[in-house]
């Protein structure tokens, strides 16, 4: 941790170590330095000069490779338009550092830690380098406790661990960002501590929507910014790959400060971790590395590990991380989601089949997993209910081929009952979201874990066999389902 702003470092003695650009390939630059003056890997370089139109250029780069012959290869964190061979490059002598602490709350930053919300500069009294080692094994905390989200399907079938890493896996358009925004709404508001949101390579519109949503809900307090509870770090789709590759580390560095120095419990939301891998792949190819499986970078597992291992709980505080993971072509065996799976304590898998049925959130309870779903952690009642729900849904899945060919009438009495209950369970797993109120017209519902377990127990036991399955669709707790059934009966 250093208390000097980065600008001060650049303007003093280190400026003597200057080089010049020898080659530009898209976002990648080759820079020559004097013999014996090569910068270290991950050092931050600054290109200063003027483009042909006479405009000032100030581009920050990060050293990726040492090429020999006193040359290094660096990746730019902003557009390389206007850069020319021969331009002066200054070695800052340190990795990229970003502002940390309370000054970041309520503000939006880019990958360099510069505010981009037009609210003026940040007083960066304390900055921290984005490249660090993971906490030592002896510092890690091993307490196990559940993080209640208020979303039925998540809390029941794949509960989240406090201080754990959670992956939201899904293809294009199945609802990952809506789910992550609902989790921010339910958890960040109720959560006393601070949150950090890293927008990695996603749509600018979604970043804007999230910012407006947070201002409305007072998670960002515009009247008194210092009372805000969240810091936002954006490196959106239109940014060069260098920025998208490092913006996750910028967000993580801000979260680590709250954990290690302020000793707080922090929430870290990342949307989307796949874009971090994708940007790494672009940089790797531009740097001339041989691609690995499916065209990904050969260092995929190392890059993912160096990010994920820093997201952990220590004896000082915790970081609970919720990460959206895009699944290319709905293929969970693709190297990017498959590598992310290995780091997750809980996986929430979104299904296109459920989304097509109109069941939102489209979370598949059979594919979703959690290390927390053990009877000695969640209790016998929760465990038995979750297993009962999964068994019923699995049996329904097995019977679907028979139903498609022969029809429901050919099933045994017991199987017909299983199908009826499974269809009720499937619909009861849907839930109206607060963040989707403007689209659906239905008010959002937060359902406590106790109410969730009670509702599914009643369906499994057969108490609600007489109610129509439509009564269970898009409701909160089980009392709302029975009330909806009564309304449907009156209408019919």
Curated annotation (Swiss-Prot):
Q: Does the keyword Transport apply?
A: yes
Tell me, which GO biological process terms does this entry list? proton motive force-driven mitochondrial ATP synthesis
Write down any Gene Ontology CC term: proton-transporting ATP synthase complex
Where do the annotations place ATP binding? 170-177
Compartments (UniProt record): Plastid, Chloroplast thylakoid membrane
Q: Kind of enzyme, top EC level?
A: translocase
**Entry membrane topology:** Peripheral membrane protein
Q: Which reaction does it catalyse?
A: ATP + H2O + 4 H(+)(in) = ADP + phosphate + 5 H(+)(out)
Q: What is its main location?
A: plastid
Q: Which Pfam families match?
A: ATP-synt_ab, ATP-synt_ab_N, ATP-synt_VA_C
PANTHER family given in the database record:
ATP SYNTHASE, ATP SYNTHASE SUBUNIT BETA, MITOCHONDRIAL
Q: Which NCBIfam families match?
A: atpD
Q: How does it assemble?
A: F-type ATPases have 2 components, CF(1) - the catalytic core - and CF(0) - the membrane proton channel. CF(1) has five subunits: alpha(3), beta(3), gamma(1), delta(1), epsilon(1). CF(0) has four main subunits: a(1), b(1), b'(1) and c(9-12).
The entry's family comment says: Belongs to the ATPase alpha/beta chains family.
**Protein's name according to its UniProt entry:** ATP synthase subunit beta, chloroplastic
